[in-house]
Design a protein with these regions (language model features):
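Negatively charged, low-complexity tracts enriched in Asp/Glu with abundant Ser/Thr
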Residues: 1-24
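Intrinsic disorder/low-complexity signature
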Residues: 31, 42-43, 81, 86
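Short amphipathic beta-strand and strand-loop transition segments with alternating hydrophobic
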Residues: 24-34
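Short amphipathic alpha-helical "recognition" segments used for binding
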Residues: 7-11, 15, 33, 72-76
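Mixed-charge, Lys/Arg-enriched low-complexity segments
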Residues: 48-92
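A structural detector for beta-sheet-dominated domains
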Residues: 17, 28-30, 45, 76-77
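Short aromatic-glycine-(Arg/Gly/Cys) micro-motifs in beta-strand/loop hairpins
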Residues: 32-58
Length: 92
């Protein structure tokens, strides 16, 4: 038996800097419950580091939204800050 289910509602592929790979972004919709309580989480395949001396990557401040459009806006806002230093997201 599963605890929850999410449906992928949008996927994006970003070309960033000179990486030999592309950064992927995904928006999902948590199913179940009533429509007024729907949650739209988003995630990315990689996180960026502000600079080489940074102790770790810069994580998104907010990854849950109340609408698909808000989740997409948060994803794009995070991607605009991307630098040339990336670390894989182990949970993507």
């Amino acid at each position: 038996m599963y605890k929850s289910v999410e449906k992928v509602v949008a996927e994006y592929v970003f070309t960033v800097g000179s990486f030999p790979f592309r950064i992927k972004g995904r928006v999902t919709e948590k199913l179940g419950g009533d429509l007024a309580q729907r949650v739209y989480p988003w995630t990315v395949s990689h996180f960026y580091k502000f600079n080489k001396e940074a102790p770790g990557p810069t994580y998104p401040a907010k990854t849950d939204a109340t609408t698909k459009e808000e989740a997409e806006r948060l994803l794009y806002t995070y991607m605009r800050g991307f630098t040339d230093i990336a670390e894989p997201n182990a949970f993507y």
